[in-house]
Each structure stands twice: as structure tokens, then as C-alpha cells.
Amino acid sequence: MRDIPNSALILGLAGLVPFFWGVATSYDPVLHNLSLTWLSERYTGSSVNLIYGTIILAFMSGVLWGFSANVSDKRRPIGLILSVLPALWAFFTFNGPFINPFISLIVGFLGVFAIDVRFYYWQLTPKWWLTLRSILTFCLLYTSPSPRDRIRS
């Protein structure tokens, strides 16, 4: 963890705040009601995790695209194809009738991590990348929404 640049670690951890907010507003009745009153249902409970999770999957597609675009050998086309999969996964599965969006989110994060591992072994990422992504992915899975909010209004 010492090799991760401070800015990358701080910003990565800051990106987890909405996920922890989703968990907090799922379990704490006071935060739940405050969030409903001052924000909206979209920023409360598992809704925030699903919405923000979709954004993160698309964001990670862009990051992976950038890694792939920097090489000029046979890894580039495969990397570019792999890099768009998380965004396409989010688009086609989150609102479809075939898979629960909560399960889709978890599968999407695991898929991104698998691509991260592949890119790391292809040496497309910085040396510290997989350590950071391991920490963030663990936290994402830990805060993954359940199909039911814990608190009912």
C-alpha cells in the first residue's frame, strides 16, 4: 500500500463515500429520514449504490480504455474490447428483466477486477494499480446493496 500515490489513494477512497452513504442510510433510521427529506429517494439506501455503481462501472471502462489506447501491439484491440465491457454490462443488465440489478452490480465489479488483473499482467497499468483496485473492489463488494433496504419508511 506504500507504493500507491497519496492522491490516487485519497481520491479512490473518496469515491467510496457514496457507497458508504447508501449503507448508512439503509441501516440508520435518522440518516434515512434526513436523506429522504433533504435529498431524495435516489440518494437514500440501496438506490444511491445502484445509481453510483452504474456511474463507476462506466468510469472504469474509460480508465481501462485509456490503458489500452497507450499500447501499439496486439494487446490494444483486445484491451479496447475488454475495456468497454463494464459499461455495456451496466447498460444492458441494470434495467433489464433478466437479472437482478443488485446481482448485476456485484458481477460488474468482479468483472472489472478480472480485467484489472489481466491489464496488470499485461503491464498496461502502474505497478501500484492492482493493490489499489483490490482495496477499492473489496470495499465496493462490502457495501454492495441488498435487494431490500433495511429501513422501511
Question: Where are these predicted regions, by residue range?
Answer:
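Interfacial loop-to-transmembrane junctions
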Residues: 122-139
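Small-residue-rich segments of transmembrane alpha-helices in multi-pass membrane proteins
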Residues: 83-90, 134-144
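Alpha-helical transmembrane segments and their membrane-interface exit regions
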Residues: 108-118
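Interfacial loop at the N-terminal end of multi-pass membrane proteins
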Residues: 2-8, 13, 17-53, 73
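Single conserved hydrophobic/aromatic residue that forms the stacking wall/gate
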Residues: 142, 147-153
